[in-house]
């Protein structure tokens, strides 16, 4: 239980106050007294607005429930449905065309298309790994994954396998040949490099010299011009660095002495305070904010044991090169960092208002993450994040333009209070709620001078799709959801609206996560669809995945693809409004229904047991088939809402849900048997984690927007209090 201090009619935890005084505010132009005064003013101005917006969500949901109880949804005639949605301010008429006017946006967001990581900022090691994933080893990414098959004695063995290594090198040099074509020969023929007259010379094994077919793709080197240690190339605004060292174990086996090829990989990273973390009280929030502070000041470090030795991880410095004209320049050694705040729903006990009520957690996040980011605006350390002087905040789970405007007003008030130039704080809008999707243009309009990002999120968006239309009928099995008309329309609509509003060359249009971190070959084969769709960033589950996905952006210049897509017909809103109802639910056999239920329950339990008992908000959780999937609250939301929907419409019974939960709890216990910190759910089935999972399924219909946070927070707090 936190101890509090009081000033300006609010209470704040001692630990948060000490953190401010001793760590956050030194070096900034604001005192601790001024900060808490501002906090009190912000709470007075915005807490009631926050509450009113949540009440509006409830009112709209009740109206939709009542409409479905009294009307049949006709997918072939949506006029009555749309008229109803307009009558309750769910669907808003679009205004005139406009383009966003956001200024001072870093090129990593405005220009450079590439992979994006999302990582729990609560975990310092993960956060540092992600920040340092701007550059990744192509050799390592290929060697350590299923990108290279293990046939013909090319297995991943304990020691280096030269047969596998040869396959890796062949793949990598084919990549170079494809995107950095030589005037003559192949990179497999190169024996050495040199720089002469501002040009890259490649010496071949037939004693001839060739050059790049497009000489402008050579942009720098390290070492001497006669014998460079590395060669820097560029394609589609992305850099590739060839590392040369004939004394290296790998370089010694390569005729050109190439020891590795580095790809510019995770161009941007979202440091997450939301779905991938489990932060329920003041102590947890302090951990979140302290790591964000370390990233913004550039001094975050983490020590851990790896392979029997102590590793000290910290932020990578910028990379130094010599240009072809022999001038010196630097490239960032780190991914450009954004920070995702929480949404509007939850409160936190770290700060209490004058009535001793917990304040909205989203307000707390905005105050602290923006104040902390002032350290980066000073640009006084070698690890500066934004070269353009901006602070990038991703805001999730907003329902419509009024909520986007609320957040923009909040940012404006905090800028004023912290002496930050107007519109320094940018907003990334997660398009993951149905009311935001159908009003996306108007959501962007109210943020047109701040917006730098829109992103689709299939999982949360499906959770809201199910919850919004809960009374319409049973939905299709989860495995069929991606084949429904609404989902493809939603993905294309996001791109269409973004381009219509002038995002090209100014802001990111993003796509969602690849959920299987061990299935890299499948990712490589499938994820080209994201740049092809016009998205200039897409989420990946690891730095390795970022390096592999980066190759897709060499294959396609997204800005060219966006130019093509600008001329296509915009998606019909009616397609987005097609509710994914199961037309043949009565024909599903009992085995199919049971398998669907078991799959959902296993996924819920596998995630919730770590969340509640260990405070782990994001992890690789084995599914019912023992395939590791990246799970966060979004995956939990869709699974729990799917069970709740089928339960509500009598496709399954409460007794069947309980039986499945108990059966799957035993499987999850077995899957986690190797974890010494794991607390089994069976055979008692009455612990906080099991209770949370069961509540999420059985009470899912009554959860606000189908969110998992209220139940998860409640049970985690109970667990921590023991």
In which residue ranges do the predicted regions lie?
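Catalytic or ion-translocation cores adjacent to nucleophile or general acid/base/metal-coordination motifs
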Residues: 2-12, 359-368, 385, 392, ...
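Generic recognition of stable, solvent-exposed alpha-helical segments in well-folded globular domains
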Residues: 11, 15, 19, 30, ...
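Acidic, glycine-enriched catalytic cores built around paired aspartates
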Residues: 82-86, 90-140, 149-157, 161, ...
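Hydrophobic alpha-helical scaffolding
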Residues: 6, 10, 25, 50, ...
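Catalytic alpha/beta active-site cores
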Residues: 2, 80-83, 87-406, 413-420, ...
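Generic, well-ordered alpha-helical scaffold segments in large soluble proteins
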Residues: 15, 19, 23, 38, ...
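Intrinsically disordered or highly flexible coil/loop and linker segments, enriched in small
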Residues: 25-30, 45-52, 66-74, 90-94, ...
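N-terminal-proximal low-complexity accessory segments that begin disordered
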Residues: 2-92, 100
């Amino acid at each position: 239980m936190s101890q509090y201090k009081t000033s300006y009619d609010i209470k704040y935890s001692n630990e948060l106050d000490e953190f401010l005084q001793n760590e956050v505010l030194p070096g900034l132009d604001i005192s601790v007294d001024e900060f808490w005064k501002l906090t009190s003013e912000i709470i007075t101005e915005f807490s009631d607005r926050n509450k009113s917006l949540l009440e509006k969500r409830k009112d709209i949901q009740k109206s939709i429930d009542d409409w479905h109880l009294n009307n049949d949804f006709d997918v072939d005639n949506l006029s009555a449905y749309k008229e109803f949605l307009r009558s309750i301010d769910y669907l808003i008429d679009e205004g005139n065309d406009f383009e966003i006017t956001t200024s001072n946006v870093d090129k990593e967001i405005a220009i450079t298309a590439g992979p994006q990581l999302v990582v729990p900022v609560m975990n310092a090691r993960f956060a540092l790994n992600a920040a340092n994933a701007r550059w990744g080893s192509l050799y390592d990414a290929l060697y350590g994954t299923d990108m290279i098959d293990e046939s013909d004695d090319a297995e991943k063995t304990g020691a280096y396998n030269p047969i596998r290594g040869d396959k890796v090198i062949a793949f990598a040099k084919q990549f170079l040949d494809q995107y950095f074509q030589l005037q003559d020969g192949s990179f497999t023929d190169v024996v050495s490099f040199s720089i002469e007259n501002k040009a890259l010379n490649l010496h071949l094994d037939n004693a001839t010299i060739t050059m790049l077919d497009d000489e402008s793709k050579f942009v720098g080197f390290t070492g001497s011009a006669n014998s460079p240690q590395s060669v820097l190339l560029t394609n589609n605004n992305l850099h590739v660095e060839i590392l040369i060292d004939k004394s290296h174990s790998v370089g010694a086996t390569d005729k050109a002495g190439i020891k590795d090829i580095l790809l510019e990989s995770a161009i941007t990273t979202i440091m997450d305070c939301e779905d991938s973390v489990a932060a329920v009280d003041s102590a947890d929030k302090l951990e979140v904010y302290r790591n964000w502070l370390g990233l913004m000041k550039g001094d975050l470090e983490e020590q851990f044991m790896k392979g029997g030795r102590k590793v000290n991880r910290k932020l990578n410095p910028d990379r130094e090169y010599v240009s072809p004209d022999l001038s010196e320049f630097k490239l960032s050694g780190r991914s450009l960092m954004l920070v995702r705040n929480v949404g509007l729903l939850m409160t936190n006990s770290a700060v209490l208002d004058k009535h001793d009520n917990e304040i909205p957690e989203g307000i707390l996040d905005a105050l602290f993450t923006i104040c902390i980011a002032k350290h980066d605006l000073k640009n006084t350390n070698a690890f500066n994040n934004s070269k353009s002087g901006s602070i990038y905040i991703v805001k999730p789970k907003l329902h419509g333009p009024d909520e986007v405007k609320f957040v923009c007003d909040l940012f404006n008030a905090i800028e004023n209070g912290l002496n930050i130039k107007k519109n320094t704080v940018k907003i990334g809008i997660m398009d993951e709620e149905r009311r935001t999707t159908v009003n996306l243009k108007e959501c962007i309009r109210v943020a047109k001078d701040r917006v730098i990002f829109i992103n689709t999120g299939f999982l949360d968006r499906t959770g809201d799709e199910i919850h919004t239309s809960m009374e319409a009928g049973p939905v299709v099995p989860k495995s069929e959801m991606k084949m429904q008309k609404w989902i493809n329309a939603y993905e294309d609509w996001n791109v269409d609206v973004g381009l219509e509003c002038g995002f090209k060359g100014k802001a990111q249009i993003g796509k969602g996560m690849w959920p299987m971190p061990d299935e890299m070959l499948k990712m490589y084969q499938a994820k080209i669809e994201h740049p092809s769709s016009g998205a200039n960033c897409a989420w990946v589950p690891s730095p390795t995945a970022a390096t592999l996905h980066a190759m897709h952006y060499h294959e396609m210049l997204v800005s060219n693809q966006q130019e093509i897509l600008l001329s296509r017909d915009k998606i019909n809103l009616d397609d987005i409004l097609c509710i994914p109802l199961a037309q043949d639910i009565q024909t599903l056999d009992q085995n199919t229904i049971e398998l669907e239920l078991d799959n959902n329950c296993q996924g819920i339990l596998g995630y919730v047991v770590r969340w509640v008992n260990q405070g782990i908000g994001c992890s690789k959780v084995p599914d019912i088939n023992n395939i590791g999937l990246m799970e966060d609250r979004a995956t939990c939301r869709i699974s729990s809402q799917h069970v709740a929907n089928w339960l509500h419409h009598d496709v399954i019974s409460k007794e069947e849900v309980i039986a499945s939960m108990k059966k799957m709890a035993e499987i999850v216990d077995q899957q986690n048997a190797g974890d010494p910190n794991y607390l089994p759910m069976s055979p008692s089935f009455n612990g906080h984690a099991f209770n949370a999972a069961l509540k999420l399924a059985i009470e899912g219909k009554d959860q606000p927007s189908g969110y998992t946070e209220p139940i998860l927070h409640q049970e985690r707090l109970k667990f921590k209090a023991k």
